[in-house]
């Protein structure tokens, strides 16, 4: 869709919404009624590429798999031509899905770069948090463009090092701040920038992790110890410091943060509980974090077990996983240290203040955001929002149902592929140059939390 068609379509949909006596269609519904492409959020600079961008996937876990899927969906834009992944099942799955020859399949990221000059256009780095900096620096040195998972790096020094290397090499480094690419946040940003609520005065933003998700990733899972990964404000919430910086439209000046681990610890282990849920735990039937319930009976979050395609074989394999991996351990008897609740206050250089809460103990997911402006306010939950104007008291609503990441994952990959294919970084909303700032807010917040200080943020 061209920019002109895009603007005309939106105007038409808005009229349609208004006519309906303020019973508003979602964009998605309206697009369906009008028989239009549902994806109204395509970047106006997108164009057909001369050839697909050739990428090497480094880290073929959960995120890497999602990004690689884009090549299956859009083979004219992206091809996965190599993979580096120590886990054999994951490596073979990607190789089979993308027809990668054995000589382009590796067990470690370093092997990708041993052959000397680049044999692809770009690399996607979706390795664990502590394994981003080294492959990114090496890729830039050899002349690859990069799509880098967030957090870009565990420390401020490494983050600045990546920025310097990207600038020196002139290569494109996109950071996976997927929220920026969601229709929901794009619409919010457009309304704010269009002055629909006057000047932004303050923001309240909450990230509800959801209690089982918390237990899976930050109590039992890879991200449970900040030393081994990154502090949770980076691992989970650098998306939020990023979205706040983006919506407010000014750099952060100061940050203050409180937060601690209050519930998921030994002192709260119920009487009768056992080291593993499969050890005959007496409270297992009523425990909200029962691994038997989550993984075995409800069959949720099973990607961590690398199960075969044939679901009839899963039962015994899941039970074996619960007896041998961290995912079967009692949530009160882990070696976790990530805070399960945290609040940060941010003062931006334009005087806007933002309050951010990261909460584990909630039954829902989906960021909640309230934006207070001089001429109106916005209240939203990532599926819908309502804008109320102080001028005429009118309320305007927007809604769209999408996947867990608000539909941002593949929209982000598309923008990055287009940026690489067209050699135009302007197509990317989250290049490293911008992303460093959001990371600096998170590093400062963690410093404040640990040292009980108010931290200055300096670019
Ligand atoms: N953008 C987002 O919204 C988002 C969401 C979740 C996670 N993440 C981030 O994405 C990254 C990956 O997370 P994930 O959930 O996919 O984790 P994961 O554990 O599923 O995947 C990481 C993969 O890297 C592989 N790996 C480890 N060492 C390697 C090496 N030396 N060479 C090559 N591969 C190696 C692992 O075997 C694993 O398969 C993390 O940094 C995480 O914080 C981002």
Predicted segments, located by residue:
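C-terminal capping/lid region of NAD(P)-dependent oxidoreductase domains
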Residues: 16-19, 23-26, 30, 171, ...
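C-terminal helical cap and adjacent loop that interface with cofactors, partners, or active-site loops
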Residues: 33-40, 98, 338-459
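Short amphipathic alpha-helix with an adjacent loop that forms part of the alpha/beta core around
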Residues: 109-119
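Beta-strand-loop-alpha-helix segment that lines the small-molecule cofactor/substrate pocket
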Residues: 122, 128-129, 133-180, 195
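Predominantly a Rossmann-like dinucleotide-binding segment in NAD(P)-dependent oxidoreductases
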Residues: 179-329, 452
């Amino acid at each position: 869709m061209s920019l002109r068609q895009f603007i005309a379509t939106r105007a038409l949909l808005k009229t349609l919404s208004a006519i309906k006596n303020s019973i508003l269609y979602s964009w998605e519904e309206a697009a369906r009624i009008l028989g239009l492409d549902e994806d109204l959020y395509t970047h106006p600079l997108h164009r057909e590429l001369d050839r697909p961008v050739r990428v090497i996937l480094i880290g073929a876990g959960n995120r890497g798999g999602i990004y690689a899927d884009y090549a299956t969906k859009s083979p004219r834009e992206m091809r996965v031509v190599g993979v580096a992944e120590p886990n054999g099942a994951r490596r073979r799955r990607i190789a089979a899905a993308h027809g990668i020859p054995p000589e382009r399949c590796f067990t470690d990221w370093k092997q990708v770069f041993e052959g000397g000059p680049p044999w692809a256009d770009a690399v996607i780095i979706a390795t664990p948090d502590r394994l981003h900096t080294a492959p990114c620096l090496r890729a830039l040195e050899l002349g690859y463009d990069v799509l880098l998972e967030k957090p870009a790096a565990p420390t401020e020094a490494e983050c600045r090092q990546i920025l310097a290397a990207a600038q020196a090499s002139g290569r494109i480094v996109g950071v996976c701040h997927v929220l920026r690419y969601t229709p929901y946040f794009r619409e919010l940003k457009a309304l704010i920038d269009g002055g629909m609520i006057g000047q932004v005065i303050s923001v309240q933003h909450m990230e509800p992790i959801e209690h089982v998700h918390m237990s899976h990733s930050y109590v039992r899972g890879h991200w449970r110890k900040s030393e081994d990964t990154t502090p949770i404000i980076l691992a989970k919430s650098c998306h939020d410091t990023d979205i706040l910086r983006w919506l407010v439209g000014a750099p952060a000046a100061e940050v203050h943060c409180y937060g601690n681990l209050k519930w998921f610890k030994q002192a709260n282990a119920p009487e009768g509980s056992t080291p593993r849920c499969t050890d005959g735990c007496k409270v297992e039937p009523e425990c909200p974090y029962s691994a038997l319930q989550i993984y075995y009976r409800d069959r949720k979050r099973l990607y961590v077990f690398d199960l075969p395609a044939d679901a009839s074989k899963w039962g015994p394999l899941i039970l074996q996983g619960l007896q041998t991996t961290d995912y079967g351990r009692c949530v009160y008897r882990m070696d976790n240290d990530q805070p399960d609740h945290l609040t940060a206050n941010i003062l931006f250089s334009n005087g806007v203040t933002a309050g951010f809460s990261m909460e584990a103990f909630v039954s829902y997911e989906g960021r909640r955001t309230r934006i207070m402006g001089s001429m109106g306010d916005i209240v939203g939950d990532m599926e819908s929002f309502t804008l109320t104007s102080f001028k005429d008291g009118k309320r305007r609503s927007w809604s769209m149902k999408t996947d867990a990441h608000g539909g941002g994952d593949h929209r982000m990959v598309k923008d990055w592929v287009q940026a690489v294919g067209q050699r135009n970084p302007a197509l990317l909303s989250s290049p490293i140059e911008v992303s460093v700032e959001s990371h600096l807010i998170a590093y400062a917040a963690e410093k404040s939390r640990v040292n009980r200080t108010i931290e200055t943020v300096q670019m």
